[in-house]
Amino acid sequence: MQLNSTEISDLIKQRIEQFEVVSESRNEGTIVAVSDGIIRIHGLADVMQGEMIELPGSRFAIALNLERDSVGAVVMGPYADLAEGVKVKTTGRILEVPVGRGLLGRVVNTLGEPIDGKGAIDNDGFSPVEVIAPGVIERKSVDQPVQTGYKAVDAMIPIGRGQRELIIGDRQTGKTAMAIDAIINQRDSGIKCVYVAVGQKASTIANVVRKLEEHGALANTIVVVATASEAAALQYLAPYSGCAMGEYFRDRGEDALIVYDDLSKQAVAYRQISLLLKRPPGREAYPGDVFYLHSRLLERASRVNEEYVEKFTKGAVTGQTGSLTALPIIETQAGDVSAFVPTNVISITDGQIFLETDLFNSGLRPAVNPGISVSRVGGAAQTKIIKKLSGGIRTALAQYRELAAFSQFASDLDDATRAQLEHGVRVTELMKQKQYAPMSVAAQAVSIFAAEKGYLKGVELKKVGDFEAALLSYMNSEHAALIKLINETGDYNADIEAELKAGLDKFVATQTW
């Protein structure tokens, strides 16, 4: 078969027209060293700090050290098969995670991939894990409460929406239990929750997820997991991933609560990465920027104003503020709050709840030490009735501690001192609360009212718990309208006080506890 010149020319023209030019500018480099999850790459001339680097097998590394002739990157995942000479590429992207309502009720890893076996996630888009926190002008003061359901916390150390309240204490003092109860208490409050588990056992996390499901709180909670067996890079990044997921709700005029459990393990993971990258160690072998590690994370928890939300949503949401409340957890060693990471996080947050081993072992749970626990901004957000009634609780407990120590050496005590001791020991007993049993505002108000107005005076110490349970049951059945009113409004006036007093007088007369 012979083709003439015209046919050949037409065929070439046709081929040229059909040819599609696909150009992709990708910077390529070569791995020159692999050790302990850290790779050194030569040849990446154009790479950003924190950029994702594509590795073979759908894996990524994050560029952390940008040096003159090489790049130090940390691998997110297994690295045993990586070897010298393997080609890698830049992506031009910072790490992003999926965000949206589709994540609620799901358990995901640091990268936002589902690990609960419930199928793919229907996300609303992606968000970078590292975001600059809202500025001063974009924020609004904290004046709405987050009810934890704990009398000891809501009365003495109140937390507001947009606040950062540290939960600090030794191991096995009830830190996680307090945070999980706070999440369970948001079941009907409309606050979306994010629980970030860093460096924990998989069995512990499975137990937490099961408890959240049992109490109906998993449906409005996202669980982000980086277990102890996962790469240090994933443990270091997990809190930032969870924060990005929580910010999705804040920026759309909603309220969210995030628990970081715990930031001590995140700091250890970051220390490991920094030392392997040959960064100079500082105090306790942590790198120099460990303060910035936590400050840039916790500053993202905030209450943003109406203008910020309106601008972010392009006018879709107007007249609403958004908030992200953070409950970071720090584990201390032998109660040493003056160590490097605890002092850093105490100085960043808006207050701390200090849980003590001695109190926990003595049966006082939650083991809150009211002497050194404080909330710096929550007072403005406290529910009116709790604020009015709880003023004397902290004073009573502080005086009781002081007098109890003094009374060990004094043989005879005057009546006033003995009365203070009696009152203090009963208030301490009243502050005890079982796990997974958060209390409503009205229930807390009734209990505190009973303590403040002297109704516990004639109650045996070991019967205080029974007295409270019977009292709450009585008030719920006989004064249901009052309980409903307090729960809905949180108000306190002469009428409410009179009805509470009348209810308690009747109950005490029955002696049914």
UniProtKB/Swiss-Prot annotation:
Is 4Fe-4S a UniProt keyword of this protein?
A: no
Location(s), subcellular: Cell inner membrane
> Which EC number applies?
7.1.2.2
A GO molecular-function annotation: proton-transporting ATP synthase activity, rotational mechanism
Give the disulfide map: none
* Catalytic reaction annotation: ATP + H2O + 4 H(+)(in) = ADP + phosphate + 5 H(+)(out)
Task: Show the CDD domains listed in the entry.
Answer: ATP-synt_F1_alpha_C (cd18113), ATP-synt_F1_alpha_N (cd18116), F1-ATPase_alpha_CD (cd01132)
The UniProt entry's sequence similarity note says:
Belongs to the ATPase alpha/beta chains family.
Function statement: Produces ATP from ADP in the presence of a proton gradient across the membrane. The alpha chain is a regulatory subunit.
Query: What is the name listed in the Swiss-Prot or TrEMBL entry for this protein?
Result: ATP synthase subunit alpha
What gene makes this protein? atpA
